[in-house]
């Protein structure tokens, strides 16, 4: 109901959700135009196996959302170390939200270099 009312007023609706099929379906039901997949568990995973399991979940959720006509974004805890795997494994993502890592690194290497490094990771 809220999503429908907001869209009638030309307000774009995007929901931050876990990469879960039920949550993707719910986003479509409330007429969100886009979702942002929570990459926090992927970013915090300590083993390669756990990271790979989270990548599979992200991939499935992104594909499902794309197939339902939702735009797909992702973010939370993304860094220059973990972004390349997202780029290579989850092609339906249109936008990554990475601000904290870029700003934090800029303290040590400068904003320009921090941004360049992230761009290089994304363009791999």
Predicted regions: what they are:
Residues 10-14, 33-36, 69-73, 77, ...:
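Structural preference for beta-strand elements that scaffold enzyme active sites
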Residues 20-30, 74, 78-93:
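Catalytic cores of alpha/beta
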Residues 57, 63-71, 78, 82:
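Active-site-adjacent C-terminal substructures of enzyme catalytic domains
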Residues 47, 51, 105-124:
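C-terminal helical cap(s) of enzyme catalytic domains, especially alpha/beta-barrels
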Residues 5, 26, 64, 85-86, ...:
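Well-formed, non-transmembrane alpha-helical positions, independent of function
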Residues 35-46, 91-111:
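Glycine-rich phosphate-binding active-site loops on the catalytic face of alpha/beta enzymes
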Residues 2, 11-64:
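Histidine/lysine/aspartate-rich catalytic loop segments that bind and position anionic ligands
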Residues 16, 54, 75-76, 107:
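Glycine- and other small-residue-rich loops at beta-strand/loop junctions that grip anionic moieties
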